[in-house]
Amino acid sequence: MTRHDSTRVIRAATGTTLTAKSWLTEAPLRMLMNNLDPDVAERPQELVVYGGIGRAARDWESFDAIVAALTRLDDDQTLLVQSGKPVGVFRTHADAPRVLIANSNLVPRWATWDHFNELDKKGLAMYGQMTAGSWIYIGAQGIVQGTYETFVEMGRQHYGGSLAGKWLFTGGLGGMGGAQPLAAVMAGASCLAVECRRSSIDMRLRTGYLDTWTDSLDEALRLIEESCTAKRPLSVGLLGNVADVLDELLLRGIKPDLLTDQTSAHDPVNGYLPQGWSVEEWDAKRVSAPKDVEAAAREAMANHIRAMLTFHALGVPTVDYGNNLRQMALEEGIDNAFDFPGFVPAYIRPLFCRGIGPFRWVALSGDPEDIAKTDAKVKELIPDDAHLHRWLDMAAEKIAFQGLPARICWVGLGDRHRLGLAFNAMVRSGELKAPVVIGRDHLDSGSVASPNRETEAMADGSDAVSDWPLLNALLNTASGATWVSLHHGGGVGMGFSQHAGMVIVCDGSEAADKRIERVLWNDPATGVMRHADAGYAIAVECAKDQGLDLPGILS
C-alpha cells in the first residue's frame, strides 16, 4: 500500500478527446484527477485533498485501479468504490449511476477515530471527508459562497447590515478554512486568519484567497487597524497557533468584531497543532506517538474554546463553523462549550428550508469561457435576484479557478433543474465547448445528518436522525445521477455525521435532459421534505408552493 509518492503529479485532461468510452465515464475520471491537481489538493502526493486526511483514493494502487476501471467502463455498467478502493463492476442500465461510492462508513458502536485509525493503518479504510472521496471538490471556492452568506447574515443581525470597518478573527487556512478570508472581504469585513503551516498560507496567497501575510501579531493587528479605519477590507494571514493568538488578544484587551474558527479540529491527531509544539514535532509525532498528539491537541482545543467563550461573554458575535471544536472541548470538561451557536441554526437554516444550498458546476473543457457563459445563463434564468447577481459578479472578479474552471452558486428547489437543463442545451448546441458536471457539497439541505453542524438544534429534536441522507442517496441513485456517494464523518469527524453526495453530467443528450430534470428536482426536494418534517413553516410553505407530495408530513 503506497500512500505517499512524490513523483506523482495528477491533472485532469481538458478538451474533447476522451480517455474513457463516453462522457458519462470520462467525467468521473476527470473529476477524480482534478481533486488531486496540485493547484487543488492540499497534499496531493499523499492523495489528501482537504480536511486533515480527506483523500480521493485509498492509496496509489487503488487510484490506478479506479482510473483503469473508469477507462474501460461501459454505459450500462456501474463501478463500486469502497472507501477509496474499486471493488466491483456490475451490469446495470444506462440511467443508473456509473459510479457508486461508500466512504468511511462504520457501524455506529465502532464509529470512533480509534477504530477508524486502526483500519486506516491496515489499509482497510479511507477518510473521504465530503467532496474529497466523492470527486467533486473545486478548491476553496466550494464553500466561499456559504461562508459569504454566513458573514453577510452576521452583519445583518449584529451590525445593522454592514460590516464596513469591522474585522473577523478565525483560524485555519486549509482547503475549507482558506475560503474565509476572501468571503469576509467580499462581505465587506477585514479578516485576520491564523494558520500554523506556511505552505497553506502560500497556497491561499497564490490562489487569491488571501491578500497578505505576516509572522508578527503586532504587524497583523496594525494592518487590520489600518484597513478598518479606511474601511477597505483586507485579509491577513498570521503564521502561528490560533489558541496562542486568542490568549494574547485577551491579554491585550483587543476584541474582534466577529469570531469563528475553521481549523481541522474534527481530527485531533491530524488536524490541530498542540500549543507549544512546532509543526515539525507535530508531523513526526502524528506517526510515532498519535495518542500523545491527541491528548495535547485536545487540551489546546479546550483552551481555544475557553477564549472563544470569553469573547462571546464580552459581546463578540461568535459562531462555530462546523469543525466540531466545541464537542472536543466539551469532552475535555468545558461544560458550556456549546454556549455559542453553530453557523447553520444561527444563520443558514432558512435557506435550507427552501432547498437552497451549494449548487456547483465544473467545465470539463477546461476553458474559463464556459463558466462565463454559464454565469450569464444563471442571470438570464433568475433575473430578479439581485443578491445572486451580485455574488456572480464578485465571483467572476475575485475567485481564481483551481484546476478545472468551476462555479459555486447557492440556488434551490425550482431553479436547480432549470439551470441544469439550460446547461445541457448549451452543450448540445455547441455554445459550451464540452460537457459540464453539476454537483454540490454534502453540506446541503437534505443530504446530511450532523448534530453539531447542519442538523444542530432541529426544531423537533431530530438532530441525529440519519435516515434522511440515506434516503437522499437512494433517491439520487434511482433518479439517475451519474455518481452517488454515501460518507460518514465528514466535517466533524468519526461518529458525528452521515452524508450523501451526487454529481450529474450534462453531456448534451436528450437522455441527459430526463436524468437532469429528475435529479436536480428530487435532490433539493429532499431538503424541503426533511425540514418540513421537522416542523419548519418556511419548508412547509415551500413544499406546498412547489407541489411536493409529502404524505405523513403535509396534511
From Swiss-Prot:
* Coiled-coil parts of chain: none
> What molecular function does GO assign, one term?
urocanate hydratase activity
Q: Does the keyword NAD apply?
A: yes
What cellular-component terms does GO give this entry?
cytoplasm
Q: Name one Pfam family in it.
A: Urocanase
User: What cofactor is this protein dependent on?
Assistant: NAD(+)
What does UniProt give as the signal peptide span? none
Q: Spell out the catalytic residues.
A: 409
Q: Where in the cell is it found?
A: Cytoplasm
> Which EC number(s) does UniProt give?
4.2.1.49
PROSITE patterns according to UniProt:
UROCANASE (PS01233)
Answer yes or no on keyword Disulfide bond: no
Reactions this protein catalyses: 4-imidazolone-5-propanoate = trans-urocanate + H2O
Q: List the disulfide bonds.
A: none
Metabolic or biological pathway:
Amino-acid degradation; L-histidine degradation into L-glutamate; N-formimidoyl-L-glutamate from L-histidine: step 2/3
**Residues holding NAD(+):** 51-52, 129, 175-177, 195, 262-266, 272-273, 321, 491
Q: How is the cofactor bound?
A: Binds 1 NAD(+) per subunit.
Organism superkingdom: Bacteria
Keywords annotated in UniProt: Cytoplasm, Histidine metabolism, Lyase, NAD
Per the record, the major location class is: cytoplasm
Q: Which GO terms describe its biological process?
A: L-histidine catabolic process; L-histidine catabolic process to glutamate and formamide; L-histidine catabolic process to glutamate and formate
Which family is it part of?
Belongs to the urocanase family.
| HAMAP family in the cross-refs | HutU
Q: What does this protein do?
A: Catalyzes the conversion of urocanate to 4-imidazolone-5-propionate.
Protein name in the entry: Urocanate hydratase
